[in-house]
């Protein structure tokens, strides 16, 4: 019999708990002093035995959309946005700020994942709209099973247990607050097949003094008979761009709840119209007392079209004035 990998055993023990139960009658249990019962979770998170009968009543996790208190260990979900382009703005002190405009297009919670069923606390977020004819039957069935509209883009964000939201919860631009830092992930622009000088920043070969037809060459790629090969990972010419990259510590300058727009400082990966994924910054953590947790839940009488844009606090000290 082949040995079972230790990693596989630890993974199985994470989801399955083996309990020893003493039989009470010979009719319901086998004729032995004890037998092992394997814990298996059904679709309604109830505890089932091997035959499918209920051993313990259904243990349904109740997830409510209500404001809570965020702790230092809490992790909120992220959102999906569309990159609209770049521009420049001037703040109240006259300082020019390069700006990327992001559009949060109808984000909604499309699935909730818990430790009992999937082994992780996470929220699946959907963005945009799409027609059924442009989606596969499996994806359409997934949305209909969850009871949410068809979405154009899906993304899963790991969260903590206290940051779970029920399916159907809407997420808007007020999930973030002006002045905080976020991490933005996206697919960079594809630049096709490029040489070493553009792709890796090589200086190239000499421009004169006998050099011919090798001015932009990458130079030597290996050694002699030993090792007699080119090592993996050697920087050479090849396809450049179209990779997933994350820009960290992006400052949120302004948000517009009426149009679900977000102005962030600097550039973000991707071209205009590409999807980007925004979440709270990992390095420059925001002030948890100012963040809506687990998200911003608008009052019933609030009209988003009448809300004014919110701008980050720039302080009362003019940065252009010399210190006295």
UniProtKB/Swiss-Prot annotation:
Subunit structure, interactors included: Part of the 50S ribosomal subunit.
Summary of the function given for this chain in its UniProt record: One of the primary rRNA binding proteins, it binds directly near the 3'-end of the 23S rRNA, where it nucleates assembly of the 50S subunit.
Transit peptide: 1-41
Annotated region described as Disordered, given as residue ranges: 206-229
Gene designation: RPL3B
InterPro entries for this protein: Ribosomal_uL3, Ribosomal_uL3_bac/org-type, Ribosomal_uL3_CS, Transl_B-barrel_sf
GO MF annotation list: mRNA binding; rRNA binding; structural constituent of ribosome
Keywords: Mitochondrion, Ribonucleoprotein, Ribosomal protein, RNA-binding, rRNA-binding, Transit peptide
Keyword Aminoacyl-tRNA synthetase listed: no
Record lineage: Eukaryota, Viridiplantae, Streptophyta, Embryophyta, Tracheophyta
One GO term describing the cellular component: mitochondrion
Subcellular location(s) per record: Mitochondrion
Species this chain originates from: Arabidopsis thaliana (Mouse-ear cress)
Pfam families, alphabetized: Ribosomal_L3 (PF00297)
Name the record gives this protein: Large ribosomal subunit protein uL3m
Family per similarity comment: Belongs to the universal ribosomal protein uL3 family.
GO biological process: translation
The UniProt record lists the keyword DNA repair: no
């Amino acid at each position: 019999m082949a040995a079972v990998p230790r990693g596989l055993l630890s993974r199985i023990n994470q989801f399955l708990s083996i309990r020893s139960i003493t039989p009470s009658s010979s009719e319901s249990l086998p004729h032995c002093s004890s037998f092992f019962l394997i814990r298996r979770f059904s679709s309604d998170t109830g505890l089932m035995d091997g035959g499918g009968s209920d051993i313990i009543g259904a243990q349904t996790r109740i997830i409510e959309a209500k404001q809570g208190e965020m702790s230092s260990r809490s992790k909120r979900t992220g959102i999906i946005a569309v990159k609209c382009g770049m521009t420049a703005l001037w703040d109240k002190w006259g300082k020019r700020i390069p700006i990327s405009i992001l559009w949060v297009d109808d984000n909604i919670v499309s699935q909730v994942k818990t430790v009992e069923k999937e082994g992780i606390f996470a929220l699946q977020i959907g963005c945009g709209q799409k027609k059924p004819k442009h989606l596969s039957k499996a994806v359409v069935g997934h949305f209909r099973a969850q009871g949410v509209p068809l979405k154009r883009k899906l993304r899963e964000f790991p969260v903590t247990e206290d940051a779970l939201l029920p399916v159907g919860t809407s997420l808007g631009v007020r999930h973030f607050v002006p002045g905080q830092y976020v991490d933005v992930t996206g697919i960079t622009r594809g630049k096709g097949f490029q040489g070493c000088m553009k792709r890796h920043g090589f200086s190239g070969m000499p421009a004169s003094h006998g050099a011919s037809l090798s001015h932009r060459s990458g130079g030597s790629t290996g050694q002699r008979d030993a090792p007699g090969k080119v090592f993996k990972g050697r920087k050479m010419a090849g396809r450049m761009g179209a990779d997933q990259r994350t820009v960290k510590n992006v400052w949120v300058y302004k948000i517009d709840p009426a149009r679900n727009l977000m102005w962030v400082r600097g550039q973000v990966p991707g071209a205009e119209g590409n999807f980007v994924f925004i979440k709270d910054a990992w390095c420059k953590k925001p002030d948890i007392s100012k963040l809506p947790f687990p998200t911003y839940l608008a009052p019933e009488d609030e009209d988003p079209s009448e809300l004014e844009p919110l701008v980050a606090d720039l302080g009362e000290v003019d940065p252009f004035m010399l210190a006295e």
